[in-house]
């Protein structure tokens, strides 16, 4: 049996999840910690962008299951990366392909027109061509967004929830950019129809908001249940990600 680990991290100091030589990455830190215990990382659920965060990343490791425990791994990790739960999985389990759906959240801060922004978000639900909401990567742009909703978390501070079976490169950040633009009167909510038609002017694509406001919030699997551990409670602050994200506009949103 392999072991799946649920990992939370504050990505502020890292150049994304995927390993890169000579720069700090989440995968690099995990591989180093795991190797000291004779464990090997063999798969992960999502390749988050530089600066993005996660409260529900899933990685799969091979090696002695008795050593694949949160406490010894966390003792070898930086404090802004925590293994908070584990479970045993079958040998064929693929944390990316076996995911039923993922939820991302983007912290938008205050909005001048929250009602219009909320309606704009809802227009993106359903099966659409999301070519206008991605950086080109050759993948099929037809995606069914199961939920896209604006939630007020404190007075005039908003978070965008987006749930789908899969996502395109920069998709959530551009969806957030569209909702943010509507929320500040820079675009009309009715623009959604043209953007989702697949026939749009490239210059009209929504802005891509900075990754620092983005959190991989949840991943749903069939029959995979994680055991919460002591690390869940002691290091829960890592996945709260800070009031610094909630009440201000993400850096660079005005100019990107």
Curated annotation (Swiss-Prot):
Example GO BP: tRNA pseudouridine synthesis
Keyword Isomerase (UniProt): yes
First-tier enzyme category under EC: isomerase
Alphabetized GO MF terms: RNA binding; tRNA pseudouridine(38-40) synthase activity
EC id: 5.4.99.12
Listed Pfam families: PseudoU_synth_1
Catalytic activity: uridine(38/39/40) in tRNA = pseudouridine(38/39/40) in tRNA
Protein keywords: Isomerase, tRNA processing
Sites where the protein binds substrate: 104
UniProt-annotated catalytic positions: 49
Record PANTHER family: PSEUDOURIDYLATE SYNTHASE (PTHR11142), TRNA PSEUDOURIDINE SYNTHASE-LIKE 1 (PTHR11142:SF0)
Role according to the record: Formation of pseudouridine at positions 38, 39 and 40 in the anticodon stem and loop of transfer RNAs.
Family designation: Belongs to the tRNA pseudouridine synthase TruA family.
Name under which the protein is recorded: tRNA pseudouridine synthase A
